[in-house]
């Protein structure tokens, strides 16, 4: 049976992207789901938290708590997960995060789809530079970095923020700001199909759901 590794920057659960990926790849693929924060104690989780001056990433723990994590502190944890997957015979893995991570070490024999690279190229494919692009991120402090990246790519950017683990009302209100955009990118793997549908309806705009894009590409590359 083919194996597909799914690397969460939080703790491995079946609540987030796993059902979507399963629907896309079918039942003939073994999903090897592991989280960078798997097995960490509350003390270790506190040590991995983002500092005030850092650009954090938001993820969910197995118990449903939402946490803000330091990207540099995640890198060795992600590398450990990748090494374990390669040792277990996984040949294709997806890093289920749209953030950038410096210092990733990809084991020999393992192909890694990085969420950031995949989603940025998907945006370019569906929305030409110069167009008005909506960018939805979990936290207000993420707007400057994510929005700035797409501005540098040539887009007129409209940013909004709504925690994917927060209320649907918050998301719906935020989505109104995207009316008139050529497309919206959900710039976090925590956003699911229900989030995409809310944004599409409220903003009357086509929406790129990051985890679904990753799943479809992975399905084409499985070997």
Where is each model-derived feature located?
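Extended, histidine- and acidic-residue-enriched regions that form the cofactor-binding/catalytic faces
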Residues: 5-9, 14-15, 175-214, 220
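Short amphipathic alpha-helical segments
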Residues: 18-19, 105-108, 147-148, 196-200
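Short, surface-exposed amphipathic charged segments that create phosphate/polyanion-binding patches used
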Residues: 45-52, 126-134, 174-176, 221-223
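A short, acidic, amphipathic alpha-helical segment used as a generic capping/interface helix at domain edges
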Residues: 80-81, 167-180
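Conserved mixed alpha/beta catalytic, RNA-binding, or beta-rich assembly cores of soluble enzyme
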Residues: 92-101, 105-142, 148-152, 156-172
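N-terminal glycine-rich anion-binding loop in soluble enzyme alpha/beta folds
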Residues: 1-69, 135-166
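N-terminal glycine-rich phosphate/adenylate-binding segment common to multiple enzyme folds
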Residues: 69-116, 184-196
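Short, flexible loop segments at boundaries between secondary-structure elements
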Residues: 39, 125, 129, 207-223
